[in-house]
Amino acid sequence: MHNISLPPGQFDGPHVAGLFTNTLDYSFHPWLERLRPLRVSAHFFVRRDGQIVQFVSADKRAWHAGISTFRGRDKCNDFSLGIEMEGTDVLPYTDAQYAALAQLVPALWSRYPLSAVRGHEHIAPVRKTDPGPAFDWRRFGEVCGLPARVLPRI
């Protein structure tokens, strides 16, 4: 689980999709220029209104985790699915986003052997802070019907 908004704190625009499809208009906002060297992607993006956008097949690798480690294994992109939430670390996520996750995550769970769900903050704690304190892990687990053992300790 990650969060993203481009430019930071702005929602509903085309910029996240542009970043994940390498079509971002860097001239739109000066802040976006710093993203030019990045080549990133995610499997899924959940907008504030609950719309789910898929960028990469869940059967393929996406470039969402960066330098990361989980349970002693490096390169989390090689063995994980990336869900990006439109948001920030501190702005509460929307009811529509949790409802979307309640549809998406069980569908993924039924098809893939998911052993854990973690945030960027858990797999790259020195570099990343998302999805941040605004993400309600208990609520997420409840709406998705996930056993506590797959969630981070809260």
Language-model features, listed with the residues they occupy:
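Basic/polar, cationic surfaces and motifs that engage anionic cell-wall
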Residues: 74-79, 88-154
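N-terminal catalytic cores of peptidoglycan-degrading enzymes
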Residues: 1-74
